[in-house]
């Protein structure tokens, strides 16, 4: 069944057909701009108007019409070239009758090319005086209304291409995201790390505690998982002698969607041979401080009306932070029964596979996590919840592991990596026991990883850091789906015409 066109769409289709009648391709041909709008603005924005007029600077630009005004034999329009806009002056006497008629029939959203000279208007706005007006692409749908269209965030997430056209904040977020990725890559490259790629399809579930997506490999006739972490393949590379490696890529976890979770998300994992948790803590701090300095020129910035200060990273053990909030000291040798009793008293839900370590983690989640606003390294996680981390020598119930918390959320996870293959096998067996008790996030036994460890992995420090949350933090964005170009949304496969899609910019086709 054909989609019913709105009144505005019908008019645009008619204009498309009119272009065809005069042998103009509504969807254009190759057009080579001499400048981007950004380049023109950077070079000539501050130029003297008289000098500009005398210089007769010729430019050739392309962009989308986002504003159009004027009647009679002359008019103005604003061209948008991604994140930059510029005014153009179109006059019948300069472009000719045929081109001027095409200009008059253009709609907001159409893509055009203009050739002409730069000048400044009486209000000192840098403008292109058009000598040629070239139609490049007909937009058959109108742009959303500035107010209603931008209020419906879910609709914009589903139609990110429209969001990018009309929402400057969205464009700025993704420009900043690109910069963040660039700076992080540069940081690790400059530290001597080697960027690598490891498989997205993995035969064994491991490297994190999470529910996986499962798919079937027809050629091999076996099930594979979309990776939930890159940890184990990267540590195999450490075994192979790549002493400094990192990978930036997507992970997949078949879990819930909320303001800080998306099933498909980006991380960096980095591994450094002959290092430990403290070295990785220092590396993480240095990376984030350099990142803030490059973006803001300082170590302080605002997130959701909270002042965040990267000049100082606090450090506290998990059990000490719980004691501070609850008075309970989990360094005491509590039995499982005592821990269960404490959990019941504090209304903490306990699953069948829970041990003392899981209960400690649950206390931390309930009483501490949301209070950690400024950057805080929380270290000393229980052994039972850290199957890939080395035991702490002073207290083997805990591990040499830390998580970084900012604004009440986890941003990074790091260990002194367990490199004892015999102990690692015991940990994997414990994970299998947890899985039998209902922990569907427990790791599988990865025999190939154990085989690699048997060849000898040097003492190693490892880091995993979520990049989407980091972009949220550094762009002051409240929802993770607003820092991912194409996030998962409900009913994404169903094409529906939202009411806002038919509300167009004021005087869209009459300006």
From Swiss-Prot:
Q: Where are the transmembrane segments?
A: none
* The protein's Enzyme Commission number: 6.1.1.6
Keywords of this protein's UniProt record, alphabetized?
Aminoacyl-tRNA synthetase, ATP-binding, Cytoplasm, Ligase, Magnesium, Metal-binding, Nucleotide-binding, Protein biosynthesis
Which residues does Mg(2+) 1 bind?
403, 410
- Where along the chain is Mg(2+) 2 bound? 410
Q: Does the keyword Translocase apply?
A: no
- Return the InterPro entries for the record: Aa-tRNA-synt_II (IPR004364), aa-tRNA-synth_II (IPR006195), aa-tRNA-synth_II/BPL/LPL (IPR045864), Lys-tRNA-ligase_II (IPR002313), Lys-tRNA-ligase_II_N (IPR044136), Lys-tRNA-synth_II_C (IPR018149), NA-bd_OB-fold (IPR012340), NA-bd_OB_tRNA (IPR004365)
Predominant cellular place of this UniProt entry's protein: cytoplasm
An example of a GO molecular function for this protein is: ATP binding
Question: Which cofactors are required for activity?
Answer: Mg(2+)
Family, per entry: Belongs to the class-II aminoacyl-tRNA synthetase family.
Q: How does it assemble?
A: Homodimer.
Q: What is this protein called?
A: Lysine--tRNA ligase
Please report the organism this UniProt entry assigns to the protein. Answer: Onion yellows phytoplasma (strain OY-M)
Ranked from the top, the taxonomy reads: Bacteria, Bacillati, Mycoplasmatota, Mollicutes, Acholeplasmatales
Q: What would be the name of the gene that encodes this protein?
A: lysS
């Amino acid at each position: 069944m054909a989609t019913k066109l709105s009144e505005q769409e019908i008019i645009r289709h008619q204009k498309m057909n009119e272009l065809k009648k005069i042998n103009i391709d509504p969807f254009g041909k190759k057009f080579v701009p001499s400048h981007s709008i950004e380049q023109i603005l950077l070079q000539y924005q501050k130029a003297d108007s008289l000098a500009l007029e005398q210089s007769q600077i010729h430019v050739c630009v392309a962009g989308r019409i986002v504003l159009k005004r004027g009647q009679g034999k002359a008019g103005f329009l604003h061209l948008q070239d991604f994140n930059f806009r510029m005014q153009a002056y179109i006059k019948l006497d300069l472009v000719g009758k045929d081109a001027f008629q095409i200009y008059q029939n253009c709609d907001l959203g159409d893509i055009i090319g203009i050739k002409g000279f730069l000048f400044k208007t009486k209000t000192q706005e840098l403008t292109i005086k058009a000598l040629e007006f070239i139609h490049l692409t007909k937009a058959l749908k109108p742009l959303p209304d500035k107010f209603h269209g931008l209020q419906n965030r879910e609709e914009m997430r589903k139609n990110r291409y429209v969001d990018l056209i009309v929402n400057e904040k969205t464009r700025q977020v993704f420009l900043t995201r690109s910069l963040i990725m660039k700076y992080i890559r540069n940081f690790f490259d400059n530290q001597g790390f080697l960027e690598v790629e490891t498989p997205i399809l993995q035969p064994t579930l491991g490297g994190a505690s999470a529910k996986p997506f499962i798919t079937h490999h027809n050629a091999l006739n076996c099930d594979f998982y979309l990776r939930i972490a890159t940890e184990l393949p990267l540590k195999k590379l450490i075994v192979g002698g790549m002493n400094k490696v990192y990978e930036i890529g997507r992970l997949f976890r078949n879990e819930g969607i909320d303001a800080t979770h998306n099933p498909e998300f980006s991380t960096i994992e980095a591994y450094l041979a002959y290092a430990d948790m403290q070295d990785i803590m220092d590396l993480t701090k240095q990376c984030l401080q350099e990142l803030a300095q490059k973006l803001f020129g300082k170590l302080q910035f605002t997130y959701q009306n909270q002042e965040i200060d990267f000049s100082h990273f606090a450090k506290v053990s998990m059990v000490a932070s719980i004691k501070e909030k609850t008075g309970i000291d989990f360094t005491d040798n509590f039995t499982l029964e005592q821990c269960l009793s404490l959990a019941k008293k504090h209304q903490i839900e306990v699953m069948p596979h829970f041990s003392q370590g899981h209960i400690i983690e649950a206390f931390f989640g309930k009483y501490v996590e949301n209070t950690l606003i400024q950057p805080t390294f929380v270290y000393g996680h229980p052994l039972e919840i850290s199957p890939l981390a080395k035991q702490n020598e002073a207290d083997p119930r805990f591990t040499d592991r830390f998580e970084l918390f900012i604004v009440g959320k986890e941003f990074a996870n790091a260990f002194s990596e367990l490199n004892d293959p015999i102990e690692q096998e015991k940990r994997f067996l414990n994970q299998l026991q947890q899985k039998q008790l209902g922990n569907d996030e427990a790791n599988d036994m990865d025999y190939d990883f154990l085989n690699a460890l048997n060849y000898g992995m040097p003492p190693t420090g490892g880091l995993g850091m979520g990049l989407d949350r980091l972009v949220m933090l550094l762009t002051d964005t409240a929802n993770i789906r607003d820092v991912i170009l194409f996030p998962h949304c409900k009913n994404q496969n169903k094409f529906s015409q939202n009411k806002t899609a038919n509300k167009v910019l004021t005087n869209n086709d009459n300006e």
